Every structure is written in C-alpha cells, then in structure tokens.
Amino acid sequence: MSPPGLVVVDKPAGMTSHDVVGRCRRIFATRRVGHAGTLDPMATGVLVLGVERATKILGLLTAAAKSYSATIRLGQATSTDDAEGDVARSVDARHLTSQAIEAAVGGLRGDIHQVPSTVSAIKVAGKRAYKLVREGQAVELPARPVRIDRFEVRGLRAAGACVDVDVEVDCSSGTYVRALARDLGAALGVGGHLTALRRTRVGRFGLEQAYGLDELAECPRLSYSLDEACLLIFGRRDLSADEAEAAGNGRALAAAGIDGVYAACAPDGRVIALLRDEGARTKSVVVLRPATL
C-alpha cells in the first residue's frame, strides 16, 4: 500500500485532470487517488492530488486561493471563452492603447460578480453545463461573487489584428480566468478569449514543489506526507494520549480556542483528526487515523 500524502503535479497540456488521476493511480498502484480542483485540458500547472487517506482532506483544499499566469487575446470572442472554441466574433483591436487595457483590467479587480463560462463543470438541474451546451441547449448561469486580489498586465504584443495580453492573476476559488478574458474583451468592446493558462499556485502549494508525470513514473514519491500536509495547511493542537484516543473514535473534546479547522496531533506527532471548535466542544471534520486502524 502506498503511504498517504499529497502529490503536487505539474499537469501537462492536453490531459484532463481525471487523466492525471488515472496515470497516478497506476504510478502509485492504488485506486485511492483524487484531485483538489479541476484544470482545463488546455491548461498546465499545479494540480494537487491526494493518495490513500489523504483523499479525505481534498475537499478542504478546493476553497484555497489560486494563482495563474495567462495570455488573453483581445479582438476575438469564442464560444468557449478559450482557444478551443469556435470564433464567434472578430474585431480589429490594434487601436487599443496600453492605458485603455490597464484601465479595463483595473475594473476587474477586487470583489466582483462573475458569470462563469457556460462551458464549465457547474451543474444546472443536475447536469454539467458543458454537457448541456454540447447538446445544443442554451445555458444561462447566474453571476456569483469572486475576489480578484491581483490582475496584472505583464506584457502586450500584436497578433495580427488582435492584441495578446500576458497577465498574472491571484483569485479566490471559483474564479474562471476564461471569464476574466471574456469580460476584459467585452469591457474594451472588442471581445476576448484565453489562449494560454498556467496555474502557478493552489493555497500553499506552488510550482516549486511540483513534479512532472514522467518524474513520478520514474521515481514515485509524495510531495508531502499526510502529517506534513495537514500541519502545513492547518493550525496545530497537541493532544494527550486519552484525547488522541477520543478523537480517533470521533468523540468531542473540549474546545481549544483555535479559529477554523486545525490538526489534532497525538503525543507521537501523528495527526489523528481535523477538528473545529463549535461552542465549548469540538466537532470532527475528518478522522484521519481512527482508533480502530
């Protein structure tokens, strides 16, 4: 059995996130592999995977902030808001100045309401939006609040009648960079879509910790053990032996006065459970090492 932990993968272009999971199931010789947030097939970069019991904490990582580097093409709108869709509209964008582009980018920073791209995994009446679009159905998704902490222009260059804009983005979970490209183009009146996307960070995990799939195939290894990952992401509470046994059985403990989810550690340093305070007692978020294990 593979030891439990997290693997930070540098996903190559052309693979779905599920493809990467399938490859890592073979590499680590276990079915218990999952990911903490989908990357589009055209995108590259950070994909956080959980192996064995570490799959239990993946749901807590999906809400982490994300960082991206991307290229937006101004002057063309597409059916998918990225380069994989059909061009729906073309407008000569060569008149755009860097000042106009910077001003439009600034209008998309901070707390905004964003309409997700229709070709997305969001469910509409129990069905994925992208499947409805493929079936020829009209899909209207409601705007939802997201936060754009950084939306910075790193370079501009001509691309025929279009303008390619290299950007870096720090954003909340649930943000669609494709939708940012679409909305930037709309704000400038020329249309826009995403031509390249690389995720550089998910919460505490960045490209500097990422392995390529070929590296992992040659030498399977975790980026972090389960204990290392939990203590990197969450606060820590040290338990007595009796408390550790109780936590391993899912029983409540006295509250610790720690904000949010925290890792509850046995005297030997192993993380027994992730807990959170609710009033005067704790509530188990997930028991990682049950007392019966």
UniProtKB/Swiss-Prot annotation:
The active site is at 40 (nucleophile). Keywords: Isomerase, tRNA processing. It is an enzyme of class 5 (isomerase). Its EC number is 5.4.99.25. The keyword Isomerase applies. GO terms for biological process: mRNA pseudouridine synthesis; tRNA pseudouridine synthesis. One of its GO terms (molecular function) is tRNA pseudouridine(55) synthase activity. Responsible for synthesis of pseudouridine from uracil-55 in the psi GC loop of transfer RNAs. This is tRNA pseudouridine synthase B.
